[in-house]
Every structure is written in C-alpha cells, then in structure tokens.
UniProtKB/Swiss-Prot annotation:
Its main location: cytoplasm. Keywords: Cytoplasm, Ribosome biogenesis. The lineage of its organism: Bacteria, Bacillati, Mycoplasmatota, Mycoplasmoidales, Mycoplasmoidaceae. This is Ribosome-binding factor A. It comes from Mycoplasma genitalium (strain ATCC 33530 / DSM 19775 / NCTC 10195 / G37). The gene is rbfA. InterPro entries: KH_dom-like_a/b, RbfA, RbfA_dom_sf, Ribosome-bd_factorA_CS. Monomer. Binds 30S ribosomal subunits, but not 50S ribosomal subunits or 70S ribosomes.
Length: 112
C-alpha cells in the first residue's frame, strides 16, 4: 500500500513540476529541460528529480537553472501535495540516455 502512495506522489511531482515549467517559469533555460523521473525517499521528505533536455550539451546549464528556480517548484508542490512536510528537491541530470547510447555502441562494436 505504501509503495502505491509513493508511486502516486512521484507521478504527482513530475506532473506538477512539468506544469510549473509551462505556466509559471519564464526562464528560457528552464524551459529547455523536462523531468524524466523522480525518486522519492521512504519518508517522503526528499525527492531526487532527474532532468533531461533535448540538447545534451546544455544539460548542466539546465540543471543549474532548475536549482535556481527551486523555490518556485517547492512552493507549487507545497500548495498541491497534501503532505505533513514540504518535499526537499534535489535536481540531477538523467544519465539513462547516455548509458543506453554507450551500451548500444558496445553492442554495435561486437556485431562488427
């Protein structure tokens, strides 16, 4: 039962942050990024937000811009999530795409 609630809150965090990017944020660098997935701690107080953007060369700039806009995201989550304590957000770049590309290159090199 708790895992269902955790998964639901993770999905709500993704939805709310992406909605905030569209409606509330005016920084063009933040608009380049999007949330790929969220990992919420067991106590629901810390969330690691994995970010991705279409231009992989600007990913660190996007992560820094998200860290600067963290207050807006935290305020939106506090208003819309019904939790005892506000969620602390930690923004990191999502390495899943880079790892998948490396694996694909290795597989292609083995085929040849």
């Amino acid at each position: 039962m708790a895992s269902y609630r955790k998964q639901r809150i993770e999905n709500d965090i993704i939805r709310l942050i992406n909605r905030t990017i569209i409606n509330e944020i005016y920084d063009p660098v933040v608009k380049l990024g999007h949330v790929s997935h969220v990992k919420l701690s067991a106590d629901f107080f810390h969330a690691v937000v994995y970010l991705d953007c279409y231009d992989r060369s600007q990913i660190q700039t996007v992560v820094n811009a998200f860290k600067k806009a963290q207050g807006v995201f935290s305020q939106m989550l506090a208003q819309n999530l019904y939790l005892a304590k506000s969620v602390k957000l930690h923004f990191v770049k999502d390495d899943a795409i880079d790892n998948a590309l490396k694996i694909e290159q290795i597989i292609n090199s083995l085929k040849n």
